Amino acid sequence: AAFKAVTEGVGKEITKINSVVSSALLPLLVFYKLYTPKDGQSITLEVGGKTMNFTRAFFEVRNKVIGHPSCVDVALVSGDRKTILFLESKLTEMFEDTKTENEYGSSYKDLYKQSGIMDALNSRGITIDKEATNLILRSELPQYLEGIKQSISHLIGLVKGPQDNQDQSEYIKAYNDDAKVLIYATIFYDSTHILHNQAIEYENYHSLYSDVIGAHGDAILVDIKKWAGKSNGKTIVIEHNPLTYQKLVQENPDWLDDKVKTFYGL
């Protein structure tokens, strides 16, 4: 069931899941034990300014955005069910998809013209083509623009809430009935120890996320709530810096199977 959830998301990971560079395979291997957890099973992470235990995992959770939903790779529910941690997993995307321009549908244009988002993008030399009908993001230097747009879409989804869908009824219940705090973070596999030539791209996206989403997250949320015309009454917290799988393993040394640790050099 966990495999099905991962491979049927909008990212079409079924075509890549058997690859070592699948960004969906690693979180599946790391968090699948919490999909149908045994009593007492939990994983510990430092998020939201404190150390928290998470006891349940959902994969490829779908939240409302515009047209198509956003699919967040993993949603972890805390032991007291009051917090949901949304994780967007990144493996090699920041090496493969750096561009100076990305184009998206016109439905996003009004949101991205809001001052908080404009300031966030401008902080890293990203601008919007104000004359174009569609949303066009431009950068002075090649950057992983899709990662930033994806994070903003995920934040829209956190504000708007889950897409009504029978196959994610347990996640919908956790979001609607119990959760008081929603935390958004991205989690990286730090590959700089093995992909030395890509170390600059890794560091660039690490700082890009921190500078745009981390530093301006609250202002971005204000813009989203104003644009969407709603606030879900929940506290939304944005991690300022990316998490890493390496740190997760350090904090939970007995969690992963030894074969997975060896496979990924964790």
Predicted regions: what they are:
Residues 38-67:
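A short acidic/basic microdomain associated with nuclease active sites
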Residues 74, 90-101:
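A short, conserved, highly charged catalytic patch centered on acidic carboxylates
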